[in-house]
Design a protein with these regions (language model features):
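Rossmann-like dinucleotide-binding cores of NAD(P)H-dependent redox enzymes
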Residues: 58-59, 147, 156-212, 293-298, ...
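A conserved FAD-binding loop/helix module that cradles the flavin
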Residues: 262, 276-339, 424-442
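A Rossmann-like FAD-binding core segment of flavoenzymes
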Residues: 25-27, 67-69, 73-93, 100, ...
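Short hydrophobic core segments
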Residues: 6, 100-110, 230-240, 303, ...
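Beta1-alpha1 glycine-rich phosphate/pyrophosphate-binding loop at the start
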Residues: 1-72, 163-185
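FAD-site-proximal beta/loop scaffold in flavoenzymes
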Residues: 122-145, 217-223, 228-308, 399, ...
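Flexible, glycine-rich terminal cap/loop adjacent to redox cofactors
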Residues: 6-10, 20-25, 33-34, 239, ...
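Glycine-rich Rossmann-fold phosphate-binding loop(s) that bind the pyrophosphate
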Residues: 7-10, 130-131, 151-154
Length: 443
């Protein structure tokens, strides 16, 4: 069996690795436009901040490493054609063009940065950050810059803004929505983050899109709304990504609202063509509708399902909740499931409780405040959770991910057993305090 994988990101390279673990004999070819594989794009902001020393440190394996596992990773090539009828893929490098056959094809083409429609995006000094090469370019530009604007206040935008500020730049973080991280946090929770960012010296501009970038060949200012101007030696576009669908369309795959449609085995509508990662739509666990889940964790889980399916195991990829966690400076923040505003938009009447607790016993040194928001539906079933604290956020988001996945109500979770010791927790965990409080709203 010959498996060709298009894309060397988290979905593609993980598919190759998982295939090799199951099938020691199949031929595996990975085609990627990057010169590096098996690196963590999520770590790029932390290299820019200086927390991680070098971009080399976030490259886990090279093409040569995969060669030792009998996986042929062909770098710096562009796939130009997919013929699903004759089961061939054509790619070109700097020096040649080649067509190869496949038995199974995996599309892991990822996403491409969304460029907002505004005048001046073609100016020098305007950057997107998707790859290590993008990160290196920004790192070089930072050396001569005094001011920067990051537009788009999702996870990556916030992390990059903080990284630039840590390196001494005057930073403005702009978001056209009236809040930051709008997909994951409600406004009252995101306001906690805004206060922290402003305390750290970042200028946060909300509800005002950048209408144009101004400069003579190189960006000098950004115009917000009709007239507000802010100086900028560099501008980072962190406005999200859109699924890369050209090859999927060429292959004849069914395309949904955002990305490629697959079944739970990661099979597309075309026989022997599969898809994983940012180019794929996923099922929403709560409503069962299609959604987009452009997370590295999603791509890796999909890669396990597709590898098993290709090898005859017919493995399933489960619906998603888009659980996330991040850290800027001292502050960790995470979320899973629905915000109360998203629930309302989807005709769910949310029952909500927000509390403040501590990360450890109140008498123990360095106990940190923890803000928790729990969202339930009208029957008490937990459908969302948001947490902000200086520590211990990720494991509680994971606990709530399991609770939502299992369909637990706030009443059921309130009886859950948690471990306790004064240096690491409260005798009643903050999650239990939160669900106990929201439970009272049903009495």
């Amino acid at each position: 069996m010959k498996v060709v994988i298009v894309g060397g990101g988290a979905g593609g390279i993980s598919t190759a690795s998982n295939l090799r673990k199951i099938d020691k004999d199949c031929e595996i070819i990975v085609l990627t436009r990057d010169d590096k594989v098996a690196y963590s794009p999520c770590a790029i902001p932390y290299v820019l901040s200086g927390t991680i020393k070098s971009f080399d440190d976030i490259v886990m394996r090279t093409a040569e490493d995969y060669k030792k596992k009998d996986i042929d990773v062909i770098t710096e090539v562009e796939v130009t054609a997919v013929d699903s009828k004759n089961k061939t893929v054509t790619y070109k490098s700097k020096s040649k063009q080649k067509t190869i056959a496949y038995d199974k094809l995996v599309l892991a083409t990822g996403g491409k940065p969304f460029v907002p429609p505004m005048d001046g995006v073609e100016l020098d000094g305007v950057y997107q950050i998707r790859t290590i090469e993008d990160g290196i370019e920004v790192q070089e530009a930072m050396k001569d810059a005094k001011s920067a604007i990051v537009t788009g206040a999702g996870l990556i935008g916030i992390e990059i803004a903080f990284a630039l500020k840590k390196q001494g730049l005057n930073v403005t973080l702009s978001e056209m929505m009236p809040q930051i991280v709008p997909r994951s946090l409600d406004k009252d929770m995101s306001d906690i983050l805004v206060s922290y960012l402003e305390m750290e010296g970042i200028n946060v501009v909300l509800g005002k899109p950048i209408t144009k970038l101004i400069g003579d060949g190189k960006v000098e200012k950004a115009c917000f709304g009709d007239e507000e101007l802010i100086d900028a030696d560099m501008v980072i576009l962190a406005t999200g990504v859109r699924a890369e669908l050209e090859l999927a369309k060429m292959a004849g795959c069914e395309i949904g609202r955002w990305a490629i449609i697959t079944n739970r085995h990661m099979e597309t509508s075309v026989e022997d063509v599969y898809a994983v990662g940012d180019c794929v739509e996923s099922k929403d666990l709560i409503l069962g509708s299609n959604t987009i889940s452009q997370l590295g964790t999603t791509a890796v889980r999909q890669s396990k399902a597709v590898a098993r399916t290709i090898c005859g195991w017919r493995s399933n990829f489960n619906p998603v909740l888009n659980s996330m966690v991040s850290k800027v400076g001292k502050l960790e923040f995470g979320a899973v499931g629905y915000t109360s505003s998203f629930a309302q938009q989807n005709r769910i009447r949310p029952i909500v409780q927000k509390i403040e607790a501590l990360t450890r016993a109140r008498y123990y040194p360095n106990a940190k405040p923890m803000d928790i928001k729990v969202i339930c539906d009208s029957e008490g079933r937990i459908i969302g959770c948001q947490i902000i604290a200086e520590e211990r956020v990720a494991e509680r988001i994971d606990s709530m991910t399991l609770a939502i996945t299992e369909g637990l109500t706030c009443f059921e979770l309130s009886n859950m057993e948690f471990a306790y010791a004064p240096p690491v927790s409260m005798v009643t965990d903050p999650l239990i305090l939160a669900v106990e409080e929201v439970s009272k709203k049903f009495s």
